[in-house]
């Protein structure tokens, strides 16, 4: 939602001030380059508490990079290069640049530095009013399941070894078999931990075997999440077999 703000910030005229005149802000392709420079590759929003990976030099929001720092062998989410979590540092130069540009709030039109835009938008009455008027989610057919805004994401998962994101269940199995077949580390199964019965602290002794035996099918396709794990597994197996 901040992409238009970045372009607006890049194209606004510079106010005169003390010292030598500043060069005109970039426009066109240069503005697009500025937008890319200030956007986190993970959340695609303006950087928030930006941090940089020393090895490859890529920058992310501190919070966005956190899942990668929790795995035994972290990889850069952008280039997949291994990195040392101890060598992730605050991107001070990026924060300084964010503080030098202002853009109008999309709700109240007040000019705010890009560094403070997220916090401003979260408390802006005009923005909240706009959000309140947005259409609300309504299921196409009646369902006993909670609406999506109230349930965890069970469609995509994060690799517990390297932090690769947005993997569906089959992609997670394929990714782990191709990239982590010989990794001896005990890790938490992201599929199981997303389930109501899952234990987010339990680490599988042999995660790859667990994946192959437990997660050949998608729980989302077959499972009623209101029943316990064993009943859900049996129901899913029965329905899966009936489709084959």
Swiss-Prot record:
Pathway: Protein modification; protein ubiquitination. This is E3 ubiquitin-protein ligase RNF166. Its EC number is 2.3.2.27. It catalyses: S-ubiquitinyl-[E2 ubiquitin-conjugating enzyme]-L-cysteine + [acceptor protein]-L-lysine = [E2 ubiquitin-conjugating enzyme]-L-cysteine + N(6)-ubiquitinyl-[acceptor protein]-L-lysine. GO terms for molecular function: ubiquitin protein ligase activity; zinc ion binding. It comes from Gallus gallus (Chicken). It comes from the Eukaryota. Residues 15-28 have a biased composition (Pro residues). SUPFAM superfamilies: RING/U-box. Residues 228-244 form the UIM domain. A zinc finger (RING-type) spans 40-80. CDD domains: RING-HC_RNF166. E3 ubiquitin-protein ligase that promotes the ubiquitination of different substrates. It is found in: Cytoplasm. A zinc finger (C2HC RNF-type) spans 105-124. GO terms for cellular component: cytoplasm. Residues 10-30 are annotated as: Disordered. Gene3D superfamilies: Zinc/RING finger domain, C3HC4 (zinc finger). GO terms for biological process: protein polyubiquitination; ubiquitin-dependent protein catabolic process. PROSITE patterns: UIM, ZF_C2HC_RNF, ZF_RING_1, ZF_RING_2.
């Amino acid at each position: 939602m901040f992409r238009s703000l970045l372009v607006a910030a890049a194209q606004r005229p510079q106010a005169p001030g003390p010292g030598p005149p500043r060069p005109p802000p970039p426009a066109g392709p240069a503005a697009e380059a500025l937008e890319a420079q200030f956007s986190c590759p993970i959340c695609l929003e303006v950087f928030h508490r930006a941090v940089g990976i020393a090895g490859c030099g890529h920058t992310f929001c501190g919070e966005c990079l956190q899942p990668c720092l929790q795995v035994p062998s972290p990889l850069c989410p952008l280039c997949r290069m291994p990195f040392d979590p101890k060598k992730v540092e605050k991107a001070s130069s990026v924060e300084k640049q964010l503080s030098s540009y202002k853009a109008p709030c999309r709700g109240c039109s007040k000019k705010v530095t890009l560094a403070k835009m997220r916090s401003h938008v979260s408390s802006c009455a005009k923005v909240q009013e706009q959000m309140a008027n947005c259409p609300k989610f309504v299921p196409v057919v009646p369902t006993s399941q909670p609406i999506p805004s109230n349930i965890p994401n069970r469609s995509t998962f994060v690799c517990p070894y390297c932090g690769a994101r947005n993997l569906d269940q089959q992609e997670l199995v394929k990714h782990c078999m191709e990239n982590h077949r010989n990794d001896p580390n005990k890790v938490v199964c992201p599929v199981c931990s997303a389930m109501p019965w899952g234990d987010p602290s339990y680490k599988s002794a042999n995660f790859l075997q667990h994946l192959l035996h437990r997660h050949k099918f998608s729980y989302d396709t077959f499972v009623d999440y209101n029943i316990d794990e064993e009943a859900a597994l049996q129901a899913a197996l029965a329905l899966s077999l009936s489709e084959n």
